[in-house]
Amino acid sequence: MSDRLRIGTWNVEYAAGAAKNARRIARMREGEAAIWVLTETHDELVLGDGYHVLPTEQRPHGRAGGRWVAIASRFPFTRAIPTHDPLRTVAGMIETPLGAVIVCGTVLPWHTDPGPSGDSRSWVEHHRVVPEQAAEWAALRAAHPGVHLCVAGDLNTDLGGAHYYGTKRGRAALVEGLRAADLVCLTSTDRVPAGWLGHPPIDHICATASLAARASVVEAWDGTAPDGLRLSDHSALAVELRGPR
């Protein structure tokens, strides 16, 4: 059995359009990612029969089948793990070549997210939700001490490089939350090879610190295809995690 595992994440901009979905799927299947954490997705975007899918609940607005997050895995889920916010987060345990891994997919609030009240000011929701989700990551680590944890999805903040999107407060809270849960961001700007993306990523893959030294970004592409077709307003990334030698 291989001691390598590739995990990717992509915000697919609500997975609208059959022709665009075909292009999105083809692009993702070009690589070797065994697990994809898709955000702003839809049930119509199906990677193939070889994938097991664990989605969030139906989005309360928009067309039927819309999901904030769906985890698609070539390896079966051994269990689903309840989350505090089943609309925007989903978690499941997967037996992988590196052993058991809990994958937690999420969409953190963006700058104009109106929040439950419908009138939250810019970045207020992001600042409120990051500590809540960080506490959940730490709780998952405490409840499953022998299991690797991967948190991935649309974090709506760049990390580890020149400022692009986010706030100092939100970035600091996210960094501290990852640290407290023994997680390392594997897709910070400084970890993405120069020239691969037009802008620093705000979608990220984070994993247990013990895996970080043997992890690297292996794929990244912008949301607009080389022929000019817009497939998303977000870039996609994939990392490879390697087991001990």
Task: Describe these PLM feature segments.
Residues 1-9, 13-26, 73-245:
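Active-site regions of metal-assisted phosphoester/phosphodiester hydrolases
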Residues 33-36:
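Proline-aspartate-enriched helix->loop->beta-strand connector
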Residues 38-44, 210-211:
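Short, polar loop motifs at secondary-structure junctions
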Residues 46-47, 159:
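Extracytoplasmic/secreted cell-surface and envelope-processing proteins
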Residues 49-59:
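Active-site regions of enzymes building and remodeling cell-envelope glycoconjugates
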Residues 57-64, 82-86:
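Short, ordered beta-strand-loop transition motifs
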Residues 61-73:
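Short, charged, surface-exposed secondary-structure boundary motifs
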